[in-house]
Amino acid sequence: MIEKEEGTGTTSELFPPLLLRSGQVLKNRIVKAAMEENMAGTGQLPDERILTLYRRWAAGGVVLDEHSPLKPFAEWAKAGKSGGGAIWMQINQPGRQIPSGTPGVVWGPSGIGVSMGRHSSRFGRPTAMTPRQIDDTVTRFAVTAHRAEKAGFDGVEVHAAHGYLPSQFLSPPVNKRTDQWGGSLENRARMLLDIVRAVRAAVSPSFAVAVKLNSADFQRGGFDADDARQVIAMLEPLGVDLVELSGGSYESPAMTGRPADDSTQARGAYFLDLAKDLVRTSPVPLMLTGGVTRRVTAERVLYNEVARPTLSERRPHSGSVVRATHCAATEHQ
């Protein structure tokens, strides 16, 4: 939650509207980042508890959201937009980062499980996906985006960060494939790019499409800032409205507030230094997520650090929300 306080200037950079490539206009530059509320009702559907929560968030500004019958989701979208902002659905496939005992097959780019020492057994051992399974997953993202638009959401965000499935394909230590989805960065990014193409084709031109991407995996030999720069450039021709920058995975949870650089932590924005570097060459607006909890920090990011930022914040229970637009900063999911 971004605390209310006096800003750093008479005209705050947090509040001007942001025109996206799709033509959608966001009211300001603060976003509630997508998260797991763990509040689903019977049948894993949104119910009155989550609608109440989103009405409260909507009173403060723009929101992003996560993942059946369409009516409960339509009610969810309506609640999220009740304050006049926009609501986007985040679409995710966890891949190997799925708890042990979950029904079904655990998928991954390769048969490499999550390595967390004595906690590794908490996650299922993945099976390397076949080309047909990869194509089916791409289709499922597109179908979900189409249904999200029908339900009244204003956009979707493809989750390709935090060690989830598209992020696993991007990561050299996890993706050991030798086919068209492995090896070079272009091959490792193929699944994500195919997902974005399919999603963009499945929705209307005015429907926003975003991607959540690691600025770095924070693992030896992993996806890094230079990789992120190249992937952002690959996404631009596909009609992406913005890219949300985060970092880490379950194995290296930088997104929880454990960044590699202590000075960045002290300044309150976990991935600010990486974002400052990436924004110089990014052809699309960037949203910065992680650790921006005070208005003065958010304004410093916008005034002095990241030229085109969007600030996202998440916490379901407390205080007022300072509204904003362009690129954002928050806590992870």
Predicted regions and their residues:
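Flavin-dependent oxidoreductase catalytic cores
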Residues: 1-333
